[in-house]
């Protein structure tokens, strides 16, 4: 082992995410001066089984400060990691897991472990003089993922828990990023003009998407279809339409309360039927409450020729939950978020299992994200089919 790769210094500090909330930044330096820096993102819509953030719950920053997390790094974790080779990511992450001893990082915090794990990965890539997208890359092809970009927002991203969370578009045909971004620009601006004309423009949601008032999911999808058509493109053939339902956010005691209307899983399925058959929706994420895997499987069985059923809260980037979903034939794609499980190693294990079973992986940002560009590197390095981001 090269002694120059040994971790010598771990620094941590409070920084702020895109919502202005405190989060954790970590820097790791090796003996020869190689370093990695990472910031932990934060989600507004979180799954029951994802890693828990450590917050202070005091008077500072509305209880969201991270001094406890910084103290855990400085006093509990850093002494265990200093002297370890940055190239040994598995051992690095296993130390974090062993210090925590829970599936949800209840003791050290998912925000703590995420920042540390990514910082070490970046430190190792710098030590090897390779960009992160090439370090431990699964392929030498460097294929860019298809971007899935938000046009409309709702749900937890817009303070409206009784609506679908994201309405997005993605390229079906091959096109350059420049061509696609131009389409996103034109579709978004066309949709905004329609909202303003009809007094339906309320503002923007957490991730930059349009936030309408007095419009339901059907009306929003109609606007997206019209806006795509105005770009002289065919919805559902050249540009795909996707929805993140985040159904757990409007579920309670067996009832889905959507726009103040109470529905069961069967009635919710009828809504998806119309969205798929008449409004060109070809990807639906978290269509049911995250513990109702049977409804996921039924929807997947009924519509798998027409639409991808995506698990986010259902899976939480956890190997064990994905294995169960595969056995139940519940999904054809999954969302990947590093801070849901809290380490690079656990994330890679989940991606590997997905690919072994022909499950597509969609690497996703969080609504409280940061200026950290690491996500883009990993989308390429790990061969993710898509990357999901805000506007």
For every predicted segment, state its role.
Residues 41-130, 134, 181, 209:
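Metal- or metallocofactor-binding catalytic centers and their adjacent structured scaffolds
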Residues 16-18, 101-119, 147-159, 204-205:
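Glycine/serine-rich anion-binding loops at beta->alpha junctions
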Residues 49, 142-205:
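Mobile "lid/hinge" segments at catalytic clefts and subdomain interfaces of large enzymes
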Residues 1-24:
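Short, Gly/Pro- and small/polar-rich lid/capping loops
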Residues 14, 24-32, 36-42, 149-171, ...:
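Short beta-strand elements
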């Amino acid at each position: 082992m090269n002694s120059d790769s040994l971790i010598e210094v771990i620094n941590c500090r409070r920084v702020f995410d895109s919502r202005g909330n405190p989060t954790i930044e970590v820097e790791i330096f090796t003996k020869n001066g190689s370093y990695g820096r990472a910031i932990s993102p934060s989600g507004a819509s979180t799954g029951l089984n994802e890693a828990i953030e450590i917050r202070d719950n005091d008077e500072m920053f509305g209880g969201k400060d991270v001094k406890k997390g910084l103290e855990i790094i400085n006093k509990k974790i850093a002494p265990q990691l200093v002297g370890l080779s940055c190239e040994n990511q598995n051992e690095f992450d296993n130390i974090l897991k062993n210090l925590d001893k829970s599936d949800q990082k209840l003791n050290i915090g998912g925000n703590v472990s995420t920042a540390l794990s990514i910082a070490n990965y970046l430190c190792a890539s710098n030590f090897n003089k390779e960009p992160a997208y090439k370090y431990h890359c699964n392929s030498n092809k460097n294929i860019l993922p298809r971007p899935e970009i938000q046009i409309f927002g709702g749900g937890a991203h817009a303070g409206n828990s009784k609506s679908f969370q994201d309405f997005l578009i993605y390229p079906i045909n091959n096109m350059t990023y420049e061509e696609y971004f131009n389409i996103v620009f034109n579709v978004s601006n066309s949709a905004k003009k329609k909202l303003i004309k009809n007094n339906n423009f309320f503002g923007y949601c957490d991730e930059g998407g349009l936030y309408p008032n007095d419009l339901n999911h059907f009306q929003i999808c109609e606007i997206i279809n019209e806006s795509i058509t105005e770009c002289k493109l065919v919805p559902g053939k050249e540009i795909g339409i996707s929805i993140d339902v985040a159904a757990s956010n409007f579920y309670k005691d067996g009832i889905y309360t959507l726009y103040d209307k109470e529905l069961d899983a069967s009635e919710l399925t009828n809504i998806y039927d119309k969205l798929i058959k008449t409004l060109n929706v070809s990807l639906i994420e978290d269509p049911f409450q995250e513990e109702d895997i049977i409804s996921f499987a039924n929807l997947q069985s009924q519509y798998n020729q027409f639409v991808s059923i995506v698990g986010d809260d259902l899976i939480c980037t956890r190997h064990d939950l994905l294995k169960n979903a595969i056995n139940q034939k519940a999904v054809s794609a999954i969302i990947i978020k590093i801070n849901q499980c809290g380490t690079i190693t656990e994330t890679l294990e989940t991606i590997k299992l997905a690919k072994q079973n022909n499950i597509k992986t969609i690497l996703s940002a969080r609504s409280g994200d940061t200026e950290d560009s690491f996500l883009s590197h990993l989308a390429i390095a790990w061969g993710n089919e898509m990357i999901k981001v805000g506007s």
